[in-house]
Design a protein with these regions (language model features):
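Short, well-formed alpha-helical segments that are part of the catalytic scaffolds
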Residues: 13-29
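Short beta-strand/loop segment that forms part of the nucleotide-sugar
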Residues: 33-43
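Short aromatic/hydrophobic "clamp" motif used to bind/position activated sugar donors
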Residues: 82
Length: 134
């Protein structure tokens, strides 16, 4: 059975923050939880694509705009569960246990998980949303 989780990260000029974000996903990859990491990119001209490629993530070109990028990533995702994560956000160490617990105890229900760390705390836009595709 394939890993259940597709991680979708909308990006635009995210090279500075992306390495921390991707590194925070490693426990999930090591635990066999992550099926794929998809970067839905709105036209980055920095090293975003190179960083994603080096980490084994897939780049999907999208129209610019957070909603459009999230929708593009969701359409391309193959996982049973989707995790949306902003590039300037990194997950805390316990995220794998929290996600696994939710999947086991609340199948079919959307969830919003905290805490997370902002790479740039002055930005308050970061959010993490996890939901199951029916």
């Amino acid at each position: 059975m394939p890993a259940p989780l597709s991680v979708i990260i909308p990006t635009l000029q995210a090279a500075e923050d992306l390495p921390r974000c991707l590194a925070s996903l490693m426990p999930g990859a090591e635990a066999g939880l992550i099926r794929e990491v998809l970067l839905s990119d709105g036209g980055s001209r920095d090293a975003t694509a190179d960083i994603a490629d080096a980490a084994g993530a897939s780049i999907i070109q999208s129209e610019r705009g957070r909603g459009k990028q999230l929708a593009t990533g969701a359409k391309a995702a193959r996982g049973e569960w989707l995790l949306f994560l902003h590039a300037d956000t990194s997950l805390t160490r316990d995220w794998v246990e929290r996600v696994r617990d939710h999947m086991a105890n609340a199948p079919g229900k959307a969830a919003y998980f905290t805490p997370f760390k902002l790479c740039k705390p002055r930005r308050l836009m970061a959010a993490l949303l996890l939901f199951k595709i029916s």
